[in-house]
């Protein structure tokens, strides 16, 4: 008895001694567990400072790069159908429990452990699922780790219930859910899949979205339409089971198909979307590998950019203090760009006004009479089938389903079935809702004319405006930074620059006759004359030749200097694309990007200096510390005198030649120089023009070269591209961004004759514009 008492005393002694330490250890454990729990304010309003800001030259925010496309809504903005579907499916006792559903846990435990029925799920309430956002579960934590995680979720769920109403918890939950397709939160999901606000969702639409909550890929109606339909109908059944709708209504609604208006909303809206996309591409660029390039010139150009341009691949070149790479979507960077907000707005408006109000309507009228519209009448069936097949395989519909493992024949069969869809249109809404087959939608989109436009400031090289296409939401391809097209007569100023550099002058005279060459295969090649018959055989000046875009005069100059010298001059002035050194180069047989062409032309108003385009001046971290500052590289490409001679030559194009519409139709009075360009079959229309203050280039054409206007009356560069330039310049002048009083700076000692009056044949005021014979033919 005495020993038993002694043992009891000893036991309690050690309990009393160790209890404080055990309690302290437990408290320390709790502190460790919950020290990093975000506050409720952070849960309800996640910190947005970590979104990267892209800032215009005047301080305006163009956009933010962020990891989640999320817009928060209030409970009042939720459809009752959505509330009912969520509660019925995810947590039927949501209004009754206090964060943890004890009855639900017991039910799951009994059926899962005793009856081995794993279909009962994990018994998590909506509140617990919200708590999971605080503690994302990691793989490989083990059973003990999962116990701790579950404990955290339970405690946080109870804490949430004590501090928020049920309505607040429900809306926070719906704001936190990821629905796939870059849609975070219920508003983004509603807009992405149905183009509606959450308050507008019908029963079947709400059920579709709620069905995606736990497995957004498996039940995605775009990727897995059959599974999505089955899951949606399950949710509708749950709504009937929990008395939110009647059984009769449920059975009726289940018969309704899923009618999507699917449109991913990730960074599509806002100003300068093509520019922002180009910025992201360049900052994420990896070190160039030769195997990824067809031409050595392109590889060399990107390799030099990697070496000399810190912005190119910036995210792969720069590290945080801890050694990690910066993340464009969540590190709160501030990127200061050279884009001018008003110039950019004016550029996008100019594109919309010309293409939307005029050119596209004219093209649509032509297409009504084409058997194979939008393809030209001479396009054979094999070519048409190839272009359509390529388009199908590049479509989201095809790629998403192939990625999900759907057999190719099943996917292709869908392209002949009519479905509801939303397609781009030049109207106030920017789209139309219609019913057509996916094949017809491909033809619809191919019928839309594409464009590209970029404006670069002389001397600084700053990019001020950048439009990569007609509408970024529907046409992601960037025709400025990614595309290369045949350049037509816009190539001719490089040949004339070579002539001026070699000692010729604008008033030098030549006889206007066709020129023949021995082609590489030994045959004769004669560039087709684009001049009126009465002009042939006349003595003309070089200035007349460029003003009227005469192929005969360009061919004459090519004979004097050769294709190698011309290609070298183009590379010196900033063209880095591959150039075939052939005689046809003199009339535009080269594919070059718009940005290259504009940057090369920019050497002329920059007094002969080539300046690499610059579009970011500095990058700061989230605290305002400067991480990088950027300057461009400059080099003398041509002599200052040569540049001034070329300005004089190219002013003739605008004053009397194929660019004269800038004066007559748009009333522009300041000093302007430029060149139009049109390629074979009117596939490409160009205009690149510059003033003392800005150099701007515009290209317009079809997605494929086989899509074009029938004649030069509508398909010339002076009709397709030049009007965008004219509209944009008028808007910028009205905004006070430029002045018509600006003048090109002449060299200190001008000792050459620029007055060629009396040395040329007489032409109309608008010269070759009236003759409509600007088209460049490579072979006759």
Where in the sequence are the language-model features?
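Active-site-adjacent helix/loop patches that line small-molecule binding or acyl-intermediate pockets
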Residues: 125-126, 134-142, 146, 339, ...
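Short, glycine/proline-biased beta-turn/loop segments that scaffold the active-site neighborhood
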Residues: 257, 482-539, 612-627
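Short active-site loop at a secondary-structure junction
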Residues: 71-76, 335, 445-451, 474-494, ...
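Peptidoglycan glycan-strand catalytic modules in the bacterial/periplasmic cell-wall system
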Residues: 49-51, 55-306, 312-315, 321-324, ...
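Short, well-structured active-site flanking segments
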Residues: 95-105, 184-186, 246-251, 500-521, ...
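Extracytoplasmic/periplasmic proteins that interact with beta-lactams or build/remodel peptidoglycan
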Residues: 124-126, 143, 197, 205-208, ...
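A penicillin-recognizing enzyme superfamily signal
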Residues: 273, 337, 341-357, 390-457, ...
